Amino acid sequence: MPSLNEIRSTFLNYFGAADHAIVPSAPLVPQNDPTLLFVNAGMVPFKNVFTGAETPPHPRATSSQKCVRAGGKHNDLDNVGYTARHHTFFEMLGNFSFGDYFKEQAITHAWTLLTRDFALPKDKLLVTVYHTDTEAADLWKKIAGLSDDRIIRIATNDNFWSMGDTGPCGPCSEIFFDHGDHIPGGPPGSPDEDGDRFIEIWNLVFMQFEQMAGGERVSLPKPSIDTGMGLERIAAVMQGVHDNYDIDLFKALIAASVELTGVRAEGAQAPSHRVIADHLRSSSFLLADGVTPSNEGRGYVLRRIMRRAMRHAYLLGANEPLMHRLAPTLVAQMGQAYPELRRAEASIVETLRQEEERFRVTLGRGMGLLDEATAGLSAGGVLDGETAFKLYDTYGFPLDLTQDAVRARGITVDTDGFDVAMDRQRTMARANWAGSGQTGAAAAWFGIKEQSGPTNFVGYDTTETTGTVKAIVLDGAPVEAAQAGASVDVLLDRTSFYAESGGQAGDTGVIEAHGVESRVTDTQKQAGDLYVHRVELAGPLKVGDSVVASVDAARRTTTRANHSAAHLVHAALHHVLGPHVAQKGQMVDGDRMRFDFSHGGPLTADEIERIEAEVNAVIRQNVPAQTKEMAPQEAIEAGAVALFGEKYGDSVRVLTLGESLTETGKAYSVELCGGTHVARTGDIALFKIVSEQGVASGVRRIEALTGEAARRFLLDQAGVAKALADQFKTPVAEVLARVDALVAERKALERQLAEAKKQLALGGGSGGAASGPEDVAGTALIARVLDGVGGKELRGVAEEFKKQLTNGGVVALVGVTDGKAAVTVAVTADLTAKFSAADLAKAAVIAMGGQGAGGKADFAQGGAPDATKAQAGLDAIKAALAG
C-alpha cells in the first residue's frame, strides 16, 4: 500500500518523465495577487501564464501545490472534522500545458497514470464530460475504451470552467472512482449523486475558449490544459479506505493526539481528533509561509483555525497546550516534501504554544458563559447574537467557533444579531480581501513588457548609467511623450536605480534628458521585472530619448548600510533569542532600518545590548561582503536563509556577511537577497537600536540607525545625560541614581497628597451635609461633589463613607479635576438586590453628558466631560433612588 508521500512522488515523477518541469509549490500567500486570500487551487501560481500576462518558463509543468480553503468564497472550515473529505489544507496534484498539448494527450496521461502507475482497476473508473464536448467523449472511448454508460454528459457549469466574467474558459472532464455498491450514492448527474459511492478524483480542464465582455466565446489560438487531483482523495482510494482521515498521514497525526490526550478517537470524540489533525496541518503551513495570527485579514483566518482546534483540545480534556506538541509529528511526516516546515519548526512550535496559552486564559470562562446561555435551549434553539458577540469580543471566540460549539446539541446562532452587534460596536475592522483584479496601469505594464523585455539592472556596480526611454505612462496609460510639470512613470532599457522589493526602498535621484534634470522620487517594480521610475518632469521627455540616470549616491550609501545591518540583526536575533525567530518583514531606506520578527515577548535590556554587541563586532571585522548567483534550492541546501513567502526566480543572489563569532571558518550571515549592500562590513561603521516594540501578537519590531545617523543619536543621548548632570550638579555616572531617588520621592509625596485629599473629602464637599447621610425615600445617601479629587482617590473616599452607613445605604461621589467629572457609586451589600451601583453610576454619567459607566452591583465608576453638570449627576441618582 503506497504512502501519501510515495503517491505524490509517483505523480510528479510520471509527468517529469513526460517532459514536464517539476515546479515546487508556491507559498500559500498569493504572490502579486491581492484578489485571493490564500492559494486555493493548483493553477493559481500559473494564473498570469494562462491569461497571457506572463510568458511560461516551460511549455509543460507539474506540481503538488499547497492549498488552503478557510476564508472568503472558498471556506470549508465549518465542515472539517465532521465529513470524510473536507479539509482546510490540502495538496493539489496537477499537470499543465501552456499552449503545448491538448485533450488527447491530457486524457492519455490521465488514463495511463491511473491504470498503469497507480494500478487502479479500470472497471472502477468512469468520467463526465460537458454535454456538448463530443470530442472529449470520443477520446475517452478511443483511449480508455470506455462505454457510453461510463461517459456521462453533464449540462451544468460543474463541467464548464471559467476564470471570471471574461478570460480563458473551457469544458471539463472529471474522473470518478466507484467505491462499490455497499456505499450509498449514485453516479454523477443522478438524483442521489451527493452520496459517497462515486468520488471525483481528477478534473481535467480544457481551456479552449476566451470569454469576451459581450458574451461571445472565441476559440483560443493555443488552447491549454489545467488539471487538478486532490492528493488526500487519491491516497484514500489507493490505500483502500473510504475516509480521507484514515490515510497514513492522518492516522499518524490522530495517533499522536490520542497519545497526548489519553482519549481514544471514537464516538463523539472522533471529530475533535480530526479537527486537531487537519487544523495543525493548515496552521503549521501558514506559519511556515510567514502568516502570523492577528485580528485581521489572513492572520485572523489563521487565528480562527488555531482556536477552533484549541477548543477541541479543551473538549478532549487536554490540561496543557497541545498543538505545539503535535507539530514535530507533522514535520516528520511532511518535512521531506516541504523543507520549509523543517526550517520553520522552532518558530511554528513557539507560535502555537503562545497562541494556545493566551487563548486558554479566556477559553474556560467563555465556555462557561456559553454553557450558561444555552442551558435552557434544546435542539432547534437559537443562541442570541448578543451573547455570540460577547464571546467574540470578550473571550476571543470567532463566530464559527461558537457555531461549532453548539452544533452537536442542534443549536444554531443568530448570525444577523451577531452582525448587528458587530456593526454597533465596531471594535474590529477586517480587511476586505475581495479585489477586482489588476489595475489598468498594471495591465498596461504587462503589455509594455512584451515589447521591451525585462529591465537590465546594473545598479550593483554603478550609481550612474546611460539608458534609452522605452515607455512613458501618464495617469495609468502609455503615452509617446510628456511635458514639463507632469508626473510620469518612465521605463529605461537599463538602469542603476534599485526598484523597491525585499523591504528595501526604491532609489531616488535624477534623470537628465536634453540637458534638463528631472527628479526621480521613487522606483518601483512592475510586471515582475520592469524597473519603473516615478519622475517629476522639469522638461519634455519622449519614448526613444537617451538619458543619463543618476542615483542619489549619498542616500544609496546609507540604504546599503541599513540593509546589510538588517541581515546582521537577523543572524544576531537567532543567536541571542533562539532558532524560533523568523523574519516577518523589514523596511530599509536612507534614514533607518526596521526589522520585524517572531518572538513571544519584549526584549530585555540585556538582550538588546547583546544584539548590538554582536552586530558591532561583525562590523569591526571589516571583512568583504561576498555575493554569488545560484539556484534557489542549491542556495538553501548550502545554508542560505530564505524568507518565507518571498518569490524567487530560477537564479538568486546569495549574500554572505562577516565571519562567525563562535565557529572558525563559518560565515556570520548567509541570506538570499537581491538588494544593494555594503562592500565591507566596516562600511556600516556603527549600529544602534533606538526602539523595540510589539506590532502584532507574537511579532516584535526593532528600529535601528547606522553610520553617521547612529553617531549623531549617541551624541544627542550623551548631550542629554550631560545636561541632566549639570542640572543635578552630579557626575554623569550618578544621574540615573539621582533620577531614581527623585521618582521615589515624588511617589511618596503623591501618596501623602492622596491621603490628604481623602481626609479633606471626608470632612465635607458640596451636595450634602458633612455630618451624615440624607434620607431619600427611605434609603440613606451620602452624596458629594469633591473638587480636586480624581478617580483613584474617589474609590478610597467611597469606601470610608460606606463604613459610616452602618444601617446600609448608597454613596454617590462626583470628583472634579481639570473641568472633567469622575463618578463613583458604592452600594452596601444589603441593598444590591434593590439598587445596582452600575445602573446608578450610568444614570449620573448620562445626566452629565457622558456615555455610560462600568462596574458591578456594589461598586461602579464612570466619567463625563462636563464637570459643571456634577449636581445634575447626583440629582439623577436621587431620582433613581426615589423610584
Swiss-Prot record:
Keywords: Aminoacyl-tRNA synthetase, ATP-binding, Cytoplasm, Ligase, Metal-binding, Nucleotide-binding, Protein biosynthesis, RNA-binding, tRNA-binding, Zinc. One of its GO terms (molecular function) is ATP binding. Its main location: cytoplasm. InterPro entries: aa-tRNA-synth_II/BPL/LPL, Ala-tRNA-lgiase_IIc, Ala-tRNA-ligase_IIc_anticod-bd, Ala-tRNA-synth_IIc_core, Ala-tRNA-synth_IIc_N, Ala-tRNA_ligase, Ala_tRNA_ligase_euk/bac, DHHA1_dom. Its cofactor is Zn(2+). Pfam families: DHHA1 (PF02272), tRNA-synt_2c (PF01411), tRNA_SAD (PF07973). It comes from the Bacteria. It is an enzyme of class 6 (ligase). Coiled coil: none annotated. GO terms for biological process: alanyl-tRNA aminoacylation; negative regulation of DNA-templated transcription. Its EC number is 6.1.1.7. Consists of three domains; the N-terminal catalytic domain, the editing domain and the C-terminal C-Ala domain. The editing domain removes incorrectly charged amino acids, while the C-Ala domain, along with tRNA(Ala), serves as a bridge to cooperatively bring together the editing and aminoacylation centers thus stimulating deacylation of misacylated tRNAs. This is Alanine--tRNA ligase. It comes from Caulobacter sp. (strain K31). The lineage of its organism: Bacteria, Pseudomonadati, Pseudomonadota, Alphaproteobacteria, Caulobacterales. The gene is alaS.
